[in-house]
Amino acid sequence: MKTVLVTRPKHQAAPFVRELEQYGLSTVVFPTIEIRPVAGWNVPDLTKFAGIFFTSPNSVQFFLKHLLQTAPDELKNLQQTRVWAVGKTTGQDLEKHGVSIEPLPKIADAVNLMADIDPAEIKGQTFLFVRGSLSLGTIPELIAEFGGTCVELTVYENLPPSLEDTQRVKDMLAEGKLDCLSFTSPSTAKNFFEAIGSKELSDSVQIAAIGTTTSGALEKMGIKVDIIPEYFDGPSFAKAIAEALK
């Protein structure tokens, strides 16, 4: 039985583990990032924005939870505002709350999302970008390039966890007990290799990235990526890993 290391945050690992196990794969959960809500922010008047951008399920989860607790009337304004999402899961999480989203890009990353938008729709307008503490600045940069204004709202923090099982994972790598390392964000990859080091890798271990943003971050670290799914979501990621490990 092939074994996959899962580096997702603890609260998000279970669904992905189930998907991998459905393909007969064994898993080792080693969260390399911890997600926490940011305190002390207020939900802005959403009618002031020409559109709102969400680039992860976490941004949707923490934004909507706080909105429903502190400013539930703003949900109607959100439902009446143009909303863009990166990734199928991000879009689905918004739609569960009655929020209509603009068409998803074929390749689920910020660059391709912005490439699908006519710059004329951006120029002179103000947009809201709901983000995490380590989210990339691609969307604000491109909005500014197109002549628009972007207000950034950080609703969650990406923090490195304590990584108590570091030695165990090092030992498993050294003993050839891990067949694939899976990464779902640049942060999961960065924290993993800071803790473990790339010297521990053997050629037999396959590296899987959920999308182009994560694969790009890995490649910048000098790590060759073997597996990228056709669609950048959990089920497609699990399927791609299973097919590669046959």
UniProtKB/Swiss-Prot annotation:
Q: What is the main EC category here?
A: lyase
Q: Which family does it belong to?
A: Belongs to the uroporphyrinogen-III synthase family.
**One Gene Ontology term of the molecular function aspect:** uroporphyrinogen-III synthase activity
Which Enzyme Commission number(s) are on file for it? 4.2.1.75
What is the designated name of this protein? Answer: Uroporphyrinogen-III synthase
- Which keywords fit this entry according to its UniProt record? Lyase, Porphyrin biosynthesis
As for what it does, the entry says:
Catalyzes cyclization of the linear tetrapyrrole, hydroxymethylbilane, to the macrocyclic uroporphyrinogen III.
Quote the pathway field.
Answer: Porphyrin-containing compound metabolism; protoporphyrin-IX biosynthesis; coproporphyrinogen-III from 5-aminolevulinate: step 3/4
- GO biological process annotations for this chain's record? protoporphyrinogen IX biosynthetic process; uroporphyrinogen III biosynthetic process
According to UniProt, the reaction catalysed is: hydroxymethylbilane = uroporphyrinogen III + H2O
User: What InterPro entries does the database record attribute to this sequence?
Assistant: 4pyrrol_syn_uPrphyn_synt_sf, 4pyrrol_synth_uPrphyn_synth, UROS/Hem4
At the top level, the lineage of the source is Bacteria
